[in-house]
């Protein structure tokens, strides 16, 4: 007789492992299967998904290391500190990154044991459905579950005609383990991954050129934020070419040649040592056997779900990158918790308008809610308040005075509709805005909250006060 569970989670990325842990906390008999070994030396399945193994966590480790190098080289002098010759040990830097990843994967294994989650090593594939539940093959063993949560995540999108070998031409995985700093680096795609990885290698010494098909930089972000971010990144040495069309990519003994047409229609050639292709991601739904349970992905590979992440098949759920909405780890985590609680009979709710976005360049870029362009398109009247970090004592003392906070509020009710930040610690500052918006706060609420002084968080308060043109320190 096959193993039987109340809940089976397919995929142990941020959405999947969090869903499994929450289901375990709620007293459900839960299992989670994962088959991807990533770079495990023994070839065994590793927990954490793309985010932990080849995405969010390792990239932030390298971003931190490269920021330290940048600071020593270019900013310690401002503090009266003189250093000698500074060198980069890429191998040691990569080992630090790998050690962090290993520590966190072991942490998830511990959390599974703590919450009585059964770990099944192997890819999950539906093979049928019976009165007992859904039947899923995991590494040759068929298990049965009354409820199944699909959390298989996504993979890098590859462009037709461009062979990604993760050597000379890399996606996000290969770009995290260059054995040496490339002299010249090309990046196709000025999205989150392209900007972050381009920043890492630029700080370490690469001459980085970013090619972007769209005519505008960071089109999803607030226009003012995008302009400020592009200005700061350009000042740091990143080169941008927007509105381009990549025609051909070839590799040879001297590196990579990219032929493209620029925004003016002129043919251009870019010669680089390595190339990163970061043009989005596609859902991992290819080999799930969805037809065996009466389900199918759409033309783009996404699984259709309702507002509660339920599919059209009762008892079958899907979360994270395989469903609608932004491909963000924290969005997947929230969906995982919500689905586990709904299976247990609770009635959770996710406000997708309050899901924050962060790009971990320097300065960081973060936002939540609506942009000015979106509010104008909706015909909604709003007020805007903006305050710069250059007027903040803590930011000046830290040498992080670039950027600003912009707050948008309803013209009549004063409800906060969006907050947009360019700042050294925007990823931390945005959390206050998320909490405020979850509780339908007004800009006046933030303006009347006492913020610690001196701190960069004061700029959030000043931006709130600026909504009614009553900022105090400008």
Swiss-Prot record:
Phylogenetic lineage: Bacteria, Pseudomonadati, Pseudomonadota, Betaproteobacteria, Burkholderiales
A cellular component annotation (GO) from this entry: cytoplasm
Reaction(s) this enzyme catalyzes, per UniProt: N(6)-[(R)-dihydrolipoyl]-L-lysyl-[protein] + NAD(+) = N(6)-[(R)-lipoyl]-L-lysyl-[protein] + NADH + H(+)
Top enzyme class: oxidoreductase
Other facts noted in the record for this chain: The active site is a redox-active disulfide bond.
Organism: Cupriavidus necator (strain ATCC 17699 / DSM 428 / KCTC 22496 / NCIMB 10442 / H16 / Stanier 337)
Cofactor: FAD
Keyword Disulfide bond: yes
Record protein name field: Dihydrolipoyl dehydrogenase
Residues the entry annotates as binding NAD(+): 189-193, 212, 246, 278-281
Function noted in UniProt: The branched-chain alpha-keto dehydrogenase complex catalyzes the overall conversion of alpha-keto acids to acyl-CoA and CO(2). It contains multiple copies of 3 enzymatic components: branched-chain alpha-keto acid decarboxylase (E1), lipoamide acyltransferase (E2) and lipoamide dehydrogenase (E3).
Gene Ontology terms for molecular function: dihydrolipoyl dehydrogenase (NADH) activity; flavin adenine dinucleotide binding
GO BP annotations, alphabetical order: 2-oxoglutarate metabolic process
Keywords per UniProt: Cytoplasm, Disulfide bond, FAD, Flavoprotein, NAD, Oxidoreductase, Redox-active center
Protein localization: Cytoplasm
Positions that bind FAD: 34-51, 60, 124, 321, 329
Keyword flag Acyltransferase: no
